[in-house]
């Protein structure tokens, strides 16, 4: 299985990089994991609604340029579907069983994702209504992907 995580913005914090690298290493026995960073759109602190949409549109174009037609795409969104870890593990297993070997996860920038990115999604995925920095979300997501593979392998990692 090939897993791609497309994220907006560059990760600067060493502690996030180290955590993500650790899970990427652990996942290597189950899947090839690629993390693709696209530049975030520089914008002033206070934006009008139209300016916010323009920022999301530009970031969305960068995101969409990294997604191939054959990929099954999860977009992380507050309004997406929440899942338990076991349910997510079953979904990933079923995707592989039914021929989806290329799975992409999208983490938008601080304003979220554009309508075009959300329309491209096969599924909108929510980790709940909490607001988290998108840098932290990368670590949370890759840990949950690892947890899903461990659940599917029968490992005691998930208790």
Curated annotation (Swiss-Prot):
UniProt keyword terms in alphabetical order: Cytoplasm, Methyltransferase, rRNA processing, S-adenosyl-L-methionine, Transferase
GO molecular-function term, one example from the UniProt record: rRNA (pseudouridine-N3-)-methyltransferase activity
Record flagged with keyword Chaperone: no
Enzyme Commission designation: 2.1.1.177
A Gene Ontology cellular-component term: cytoplasm
Function: Specifically methylates the pseudouridine at position 1915 (m3Psi1915) in 23S rRNA.
Taxonomy, superkingdom: Bacteria
Assembly description: Homodimer.
CDD domains per UniProt: RlmH-like
Predominant localisation class: cytoplasm
Matches recorded under InterPro entries: Alpha/beta_knot_MTases (IPR029028), RlmH-like (IPR003742), tRNA_m1G_MTases_N (IPR029026)
Gene: rlmH
Enzymatic reactions: pseudouridine(1915) in 23S rRNA + S-adenosyl-L-methionine = N(3)-methylpseudouridine(1915) in 23S rRNA + S-adenosyl-L-homocysteine + H(+)
Chain positions recorded as S-adenosyl-L-methionine binding sites: 76, 108, 127-132
Family recorded in the similarity comment: Belongs to the RNA methyltransferase RlmH family.
Localization per Swiss-Prot or TrEMBL: Cytoplasm
Gene3D superfamilies in the cross-refs: 3.40.1280.10
UniProt enzyme class: transferase
Entry protein name: Ribosomal RNA large subunit methyltransferase H
Record-linked NCBIfam families: PRK00103.1-3, tRNA_RlmH_YbeA
């Amino acid at each position: 299985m090939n897993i791609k995580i497309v994220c907006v913005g560059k990760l600067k914090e060493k502690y996030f990089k180290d955590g993500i690298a650790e899970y990427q290493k652990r996942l290597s026995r189950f899947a090839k994991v690629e993390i693709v960073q696209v530049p975030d759109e520089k914008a002033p602190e206070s934006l009008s609604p139209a300016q916010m949409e323009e920022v999301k549109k530009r970031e969305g174009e960068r995101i969409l340029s990294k997604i191939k037609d054959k990929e099954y795409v999860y977009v992380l969104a507050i309004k997406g579907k929440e899942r338990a870890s076991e349910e997510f593990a079953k979904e990933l297993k079923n995707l592989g069983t039914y021929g989806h070997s290329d799975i992409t996860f999208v983490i938008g920038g601080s304003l979220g994702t554009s309508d075009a990115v959300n329309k491209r999604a096969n599924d909108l995925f929510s980790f709940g209504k909490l607001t988290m920095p998108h840098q932290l979300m990368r670590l949370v997501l890759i840990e949950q992907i690892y947890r899903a593979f461990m659940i599917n392998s029968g490992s005691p990692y998930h208790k």
